[in-house]
């Protein structure tokens, strides 16, 4: 299980905030929901630019005006919460609290779905997997390159060519 420590940034970069939009970057949204990538790692996965969100990405904070579709995180007590922007500019303090999703709760849902999927995969696996035998049953003594080419490939090498090229081991 991956620890949540250091997984989210409280004040993400502008590009990271842009990517945390359901409309601008679906790849980042999927990674955010499944909690399988750090925000910093999204920059390497997302190649698109989202200029329409550049301005709103600068205003990520608990009391800042929040635009619809943008995600960021804030520390609430000892827990880190994933905040989704509200749908209204005029929402009250009580209404703003309704947009908070516990990251621990999000992880619990993901863990439950992942464990169910893992159990199905385990059920489909063969019960007994034979171990691979990596040691050869009849070890070959080292041959010279000339002997190898003659015996395996069937190439005839004149002795003068080997002598001109030096020793072949």
UniProtKB/Swiss-Prot annotation:
User: Where are the residues of the annotated region Disordered?
Assistant: 82-140
Q: Which InterPro entries match?
A: DUF4741
Q: Can you tell me which family this protein belongs to?
A: Belongs to the FAM231 family.
Q: What is this protein called?
A: FAM231A/C-like protein LOC102723383
Organism name:
Homo sapiens
């Amino acid at each position: 299980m991956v620890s949540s420590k250091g997984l989210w940034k409280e004040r993400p970069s502008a590009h990271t905030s842009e990517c945390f939009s359901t409309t601008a970057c679906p790849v980042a949204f999927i990674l955010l929901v499944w909690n399988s990538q750090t925000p910093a790692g999204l920059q390497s996965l997302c190649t698109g630019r989202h200029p329409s969100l550049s301005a709103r990405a600068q205003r990520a904070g608990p009391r800042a005006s929040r635009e619809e579709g943008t995600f960021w995180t804030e520390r609430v007590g000892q827990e880190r919460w994933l905040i989704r922007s509200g749908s209204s500019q005029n929402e009250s303090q009580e209404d703003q609290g309704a947009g908070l999703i516990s990251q621990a709760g999000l992880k619990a849902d993901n863990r439950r779905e992942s464990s169910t999927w893992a159990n199905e995969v385990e059920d489909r696996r063969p019960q007994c997997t034979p171990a691979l035998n990596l040691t050869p049953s009849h070890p070959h003594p080292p041959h010279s390159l000339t002997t190898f080419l003659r015996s395996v490939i069937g190439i005839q090498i004149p002795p003068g060519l080997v002598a001109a090229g030096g020793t072949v081991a």
